[in-house]
Amino acid sequence: MSNKTIDLGSIEIANDKPFVLFGGMNVLESRDLAMQIAETYAEVTQKLGIPYVFKASFDKANRSSVNSYRGPGMEEGLKIFEEIKSTFNLPLITDVHEVHQCAPVAEVVDIIQLPAFLARQTDLVVAMAKTGAIINVKKPQFLAPHEMRHIISKFNEAGNDEIILCERGSSFGYNNLVVDMLGMDEMKQSGYPVIFDATHALQKPGGRSDSAGGRRAQATELARSGMALGLAGLFIEAHPDPDNAKCDGPCALPLHQLENYLTQMKAVDDLVKSFAPIDTSK
């Protein structure tokens, strides 16, 4: 299958195009922090010439502990998203967890995300598809890459072909994830754009008993490896104070490192996509 290109305004999302950054923060902690992070991303990506989509969650409905911070909720979250969109002229991506959230969220954001833990929930898939929005499907940690075709088929049957596939690691025993680089290449064979969530792939699920641990010291190495595959995009989360972030701080990139980090990722992407394909199957 040929590479599918998804048009998001002036941004082209495809495996054979310059990579798109899907980045921001894990969960909305406050309006001011969200604006600060969005401004930093906007400035850095504009300087480096990287197409950019702002990401944050309004509700983390799948936290390990009932006492963990979840976010401001949909109503307040959408207000913050609207302000970010109008202030910085940025497209937006966020996740939904329930059927009733799909339509109102799709009125504000450009891409709605299907969480990995919910990727086989047919009613949610159908509701998302019917919004007509671009969809980002997080590959579940428990599914093989080739099984993503079943999720794609559900969206297609519900009338939506604007699909992005996102790798975020696979379960490797207890409290650990690994990334199958060949699995991302296998998903690329579908023709749909494939992006790599390089920060969530650093998770150690349940590694801190009541919350996820992580390995942000290896954020650069893992992302470089993924970008060497020639992907449609990179998905990352950053925070000005990762040690005190309200969710997934151990995986978050320190915000002050963003420009250096993205400079390297762009260099890898540019280099890999300058190569002529080699068919080693023959």
UniProtKB/Swiss-Prot annotation:
A Pfam family per the record = DAHP_synth_1
What is the enzyme's main class?
Answer: transferase
Catalyses:
D-arabinose 5-phosphate + phosphoenolpyruvate + H2O = 3-deoxy-alpha-D-manno-2-octulosonate-8-phosphate + phosphate
Q: What is its EC number?
A: 2.5.1.55
Keywords of the record:
Cytoplasm, Lipopolysaccharide biosynthesis, Transferase
Sorted alphabetically, which InterPro entries does this protein's record hold? Aldolase_TIM (IPR013785), DAHP1/KDSA (IPR006218), KDO8P_synthase (IPR006269)
- Name a GO CC annotation attached to this entry: cytoplasm
Associated pathway? Carbohydrate biosynthesis; 3-deoxy-D-manno-octulosonate biosynthesis; 3-deoxy-D-manno-octulosonate from D-ribulose 5-phosphate: step 2/3; Bacterial outer membrane biogenesis; lipopolysaccharide biosynthesis
Report any one BP term from Gene Ontology.
keto-3-deoxy-D-manno-octulosonic acid biosynthetic process
Location of the protein in the cell: Cytoplasm
Q: Name one GO molecular function term.
A: 3-deoxy-8-phosphooctulonate synthase activity
Q: Describe the family membership recorded for this protein in Swiss-Prot or TrEMBL.
A: Belongs to the KdsA family.
Q: What is this protein called?
A: 2-dehydro-3-deoxyphosphooctonate aldolase
What is the scientific name of the source organism? Shewanella piezotolerans (strain WP3 / JCM 13877)
